[in-house]
Amino acid sequence: MRTVKLSPFGLAVWDVDIAALSQAAADALAGLIAINKVVVFRNQSGGDSELVGFLKQLGPLTFTAGETPVAGAPDLNVVSNLGRSTPPRSVFHTDTSYVVCPPAFTALREVMLPARGGQTVFSDQVAAFLALPPAWRSGLANCTVQHRTTGLDGQSQTHDHPLFRLHPVTAETALYLSTPERCSHLSGVDPATSERLVSILYRRSIRASNLYRHSWKKGDVVIWDNRLTMHQADHSDVDGDRVLHRGMVMGERPIHAV
């Protein structure tokens, strides 16, 4: 296995076939993902069934209601700009945070890449937490955030999660947020203050110095730890068709950092 550190965080990996891993090797890679937050597996030749098999080695799979399943691989969903007259809307978020046990890992497999653009951008939520002033860390230590669904026809779901989340493997503390549209209330403060604080924390999280921008290549499989990151698709300068297949691994109930 050959690895290269990405900047400012993340890891690129060569000479690993995710379709041919022992369970022990998959367990080791789960730790590698947690440590590096984002891992890019280069030159993967497998398809949907191989991606599903790899993800199942990391844990039970989960699927977000309202997404479009991949034909022949219903555990995966399609991420695509095909047939759209306007670019898809994407903002920084963490996946499906409004359920009791949000996904621990999300993976994307390259299917079709545009001639230009279409990066996936990640924020380091551990660095975002560490950059908070000490008074903020202490003052917000016991806060929870109500996460909610947006945009799912006829469906509404909410759940409260700690603002400062402890990672069960690395013992790091992350600033656990999603897009402000999905963070409806911060505990212990009035609605106006809640909205202002969530907006400030969110903007601090997505400063340019805190972002890894992934430029896709043929054969890429990218997997990240939702407990430690947010992500966004950059559709601002896409020239051509962009199709990815996504799978998610169920996580644990978020733990308060103490």
Tell what function each PLM region has:
Residues M1-V221, N226-V258:
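Non-heme Fe(II) oxygenase catalytic core, chiefly the N-lobe of the double-stranded beta-helix
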